[in-house]
Amino acid sequence: MSVVNNRVALTNLVSMEALTTEEVLGLINRGSEYKAGKVVISDHQKDLVANLFFENSTRTHKSFEVAEKKLGLTVLDFNADASAVNKGESLYDTVLTMSALGTDICVIRHPEDDYYKELVESPTITASIVNGGDGSGQHPSQCLLDLLTIYEEFGRFEGLKIAIAGDLTHSRVAKSNMQILKRLGAELYFYGPEEWYSEAFNAYGTYIAIDQIIKELDVLMLLRVQHERHDGHQSFSKEGYHQAFGLTQERYQQLKDSAIIMHPAPVNRDVEIADSLVEAPKARIVSQMANGVFVRMAIIEAILNGRNKNS
């Protein structure tokens, strides 16, 4: 991976640690340029992209689709429920098929952690892989749109106090963000139920009670409680969680005037955040959704740059 003519060029995008700091900042900057309407878009109709989503998704799936169509790519329709997956076809063979049909890029979301490893290591699959979320692993495009949202607000990452809060163990968003935010110089804090916390997070920040740090925060990044990834044996009270760990009206009032609230969505209202705060003045949840299109345009462009460079 490299930066060519001041433009990022990628073969695949599967994790944040695979990106250099220069590439991360380049993608954020390019997303900002797309948002500002500063980019003359080339004709990409000959380039084929398939969005292979094996988990439910609204924001990631549709914003990739919007990004691809804005760039002029030909988007191949794929419905997992109506595909040979229901006949037992593996993910590998599905992607192998798409690649053989001439698909240039496969954007994939899959419930298996690290699903992409055998795909990017395959000598036969020529399609580039963009990870749209792997199990409880990583979510690089969400991370990049989060970075753009933060940078738009503060113009920097160095020294910002950022708390990532909630269902940490199951969150691919947390795992992608904590790595790059620490690398960019942010001061990270984590909070949530102890049973949803892993010591692996200690290398990136400090586990702390929300009420000890909330007045100092620049960014409060809330995470969805992922009921579908729990084993079903844990007792859970929405009201209990909201009062102990959620953003209540009382906690909102303690945030600095300059602080912002983020959430990757979908939001469990009155669980992670009070219903009335989802569109509050400090909330940037809608901005995150909008920024997703522009960052994903930058990602797709970077993949096409990489393919053209290697062709």
From Swiss-Prot:
GO cellular component: cytosol
Chain positions recorded as carbamoyl phosphate binding sites: R59, T60, R109, H139, Q142, A265, P266
Top EC class of this enzyme: transferase
Pfam families named in the record: OTCace, OTCace_N
Enzyme Commission code: 2.1.3.2
Keyword terms, alphabetized: Pyrimidine biosynthesis, Transferase
Enzymatic reactions: carbamoyl phosphate + L-aspartate = N-carbamoyl-L-aspartate + phosphate + H(+)
Stored InterPro entries: Asp/Orn_carbamoyltranf_P-bd, Asp/Orn_carbamoylTrfase, Asp/Orn_carbamoylTrfase_sf, Asp_carbamoyltransf, Asp_carbamoyltransf_Asp/Orn-bd
GO biological process: 'de novo' pyrimidine nucleobase biosynthetic process; 'de novo' UMP biosynthetic process; amino acid metabolic process
Pathway info: Pyrimidine metabolism; UMP biosynthesis via de novo pathway; (S)-dihydroorotate from bicarbonate: step 2/3
Sequence positions that bind L-aspartate: K87, R172, R224
Domain of life: Bacteria
GO MF annotation list: amino acid binding; aspartate carbamoyltransferase activity
Subunit structure: Heterododecamer (2C3:3R2) of six catalytic PyrB chains organized as two trimers (C3), and six regulatory PyrI chains organized as three dimers (R2).
Family label: Belongs to the aspartate/ornithine carbamoyltransferase superfamily. ATCase family.
PANTHER family: ASPARTATE CARBAMOYLTRANSFERASE, ORNITHINE CARBAMOYLTRANSFERASE, MITOCHONDRIAL
Described function: Catalyzes the condensation of carbamoyl phosphate and aspartate to form carbamoyl aspartate and inorganic phosphate, the committed step in the de novo pyrimidine nucleotide biosynthesis pathway.
Descriptive protein name: Aspartate carbamoyltransferase catalytic subunit
Source organism of the structure: Streptococcus pyogenes serotype M1
